[in-house]
């Protein structure tokens, strides 16, 4: 089933509206060509999106990571990128299930997770809107998610105690912190993972993540001093080259509020109040599950980052995959026992209903919903804005489930 789904994705990418152009991957590829000539932040790709030029907006460390791509022809890079994304998605699914197993004291090595479960999830996840757009555009978000989930997996197995350990406890802080720091060095926003480390009582891991991020900046400055200075003193925080925050593609809190308001609200009072409310609700949800598995803690932290960021494009929301896994296989889930085949200790039908809603909305996605609403004459206004707030809706749904079922959760975690 997984191979059939992956083959269908290749056909979709080649024959669909994006016609195998991988616009974001082409930006990475072009950045790799320009690493050494001092023009890393002076180009913008226009061949495939003339209406919206695409510059390279990541830190210089990301360009250094992409540098090996310059030695390969682009078609090879494109095919390899799809295979890498699918493979890492499978790894994310498997690690997520292992984290849940560790949280309830079951065997939690990757080999203890049934392969058929992980393949089934991966086959379906390839068609969820955020993953689908990552594959269409050649985006890097699944790679970054894999680094974050890997860090959580190391911590979860340490929390489970012997014989689950894969590293000595004193080395887990360094390894998990380094993974978060490397991800932040590539794209900045994964730095929110430091809050996850703190939420699991790992202050030294958070310190290591900061030190690792600093090392990526220092390494970049050593090799690309002018580009590094320019990025961190001039370009950082400038969302202009990235796009309009009010576009439906932007699923951050700022994007959702802006669509209801009919204009970009920026970082003014409406955004600050909304962010404060979102942070408070996410903290309340975390407080309920703070003694539970590491997966839900990681998901809640990532939701804070996605909602709080000025721009969170659809393809940034790949965290919907571990979110769905927790809803289905967590303590409230229909398949939440230690074998991932029976009801969890706190099972509630509401988790099944929520998972089904997430799947349907995720498979349809923002763009197709927007097309249908446009056909119905609802291309703006509050109804349109409501249906476009799918990321915010996912966060609200998860928070509501946790808070409504807090007694069940507190009894089993």
Where are these regions (language model features)?
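Hydrophobic transmembrane alpha-helices of multi-pass, membrane-embedded glycosylation machinery
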Residues: 151, 180-185, 192-201, 213-214, ...
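Membrane-interface alpha helices of multi-pass inner-membrane proteins
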Residues: 173-197, 301-308
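Aromatic-enriched
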Residues: 328-332, 342-413
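Primarily membrane-embedded glycan-assembly and transfer machineries that use lipid-linked glycans
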Residues: 1-174, 203-317, 329-332, 377-386, ...
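Hydrophobic alpha-helical segments
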Residues: 1-4, 193, 398
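Hydrophobic transmembrane alpha-helices
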Residues: 73, 88, 187-190, 323
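Small-residue packing motifs within transmembrane alpha-helices
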Residues: 173, 177-179, 216, 270, ...
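Membrane-interfacial entry segments at the cytosolic side of transmembrane helices
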Residues: 199-211, 341-354
């Amino acid at each position: 089933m997984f191979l059939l789904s992956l083959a269908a994705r290749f056909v979709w990418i080649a024959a669909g509206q994006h016609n195998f152009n991988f616009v974001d991957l082409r930006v990475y590829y072009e950045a790799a060509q320009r690493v050494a000539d001092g023009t890393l932040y002076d180009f913008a790709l226009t061949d495939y999106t003339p209406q919206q030029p695409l510059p390279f907006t990541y830190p210089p460390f990301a360009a250094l990571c992409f540098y090996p791509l310059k030695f390969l022809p682009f078609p090879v890079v494109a095919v390899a990128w799809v295979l890498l994304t699918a493979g890492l998605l499978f790894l994310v699914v498997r690690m997520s299930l292992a984290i849940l197993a560790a949280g309830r004291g079951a065997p939690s090595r990757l080999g203890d997770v049934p392969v058929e479960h992980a393949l089934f999830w991966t086959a379906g996840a390839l068609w969820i809107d955020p993953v689908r757009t990552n594959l269409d555009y050649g985006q890097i978000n699944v790679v970054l998610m894999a680094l974050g989930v890997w860090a959580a997996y190391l911590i979860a197995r340490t929390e489970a105690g012997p014989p689950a350990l894969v590293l000595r406890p004193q080395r887990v802080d360094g390894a998990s912190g380094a993974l978060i720091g490397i991800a932040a060095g590539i794209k900045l926003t994964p730095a929110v993972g430091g809050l996850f480390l703190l939420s699991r009582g790992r202050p030294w891991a958070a310190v290591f993540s900061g030190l690792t991020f600093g090392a990526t900046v220092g390494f970049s400055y050593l090799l690309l001093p002018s580009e590094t200075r320019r990025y961190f003193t001039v370009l950082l925080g400038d969302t202009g080259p990235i796009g309009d925050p009010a576009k439906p593609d932007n699923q951050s809190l700022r994007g959702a509020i802006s669509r209801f308001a009919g204009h970009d609200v920026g970082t003014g009072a409406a955004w600050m109040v909304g962010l404060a409310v979102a942070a408070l609700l996410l903290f309340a949800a975390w407080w309920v599950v703070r003694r539970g598995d590491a997966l839900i803690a990681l998901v809640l932290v990532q939701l804070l980052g996605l909602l709080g960021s000025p721009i969170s494009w659809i393809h940034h929301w790949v965290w919907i995959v571990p979110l769905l896994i927790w809803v289905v296989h967590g303590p409230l889930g229909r398949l939440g026992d230690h074998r991932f085949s029976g009801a969890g200790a706190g099972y509630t039908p509401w988790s099944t209903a929520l998972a089904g809603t997430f799947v349907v909305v995720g498979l349809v996605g923002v763009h197709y919903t927007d097309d249908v609403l446009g056909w119905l004459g609802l291309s703006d206004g509050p109804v349109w804005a409501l249906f476009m707030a799918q990321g915010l809706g996912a966060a609200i749904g998860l928070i509501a489930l946790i808070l409504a079922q807090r007694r069940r959760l507190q009894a089993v975690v």
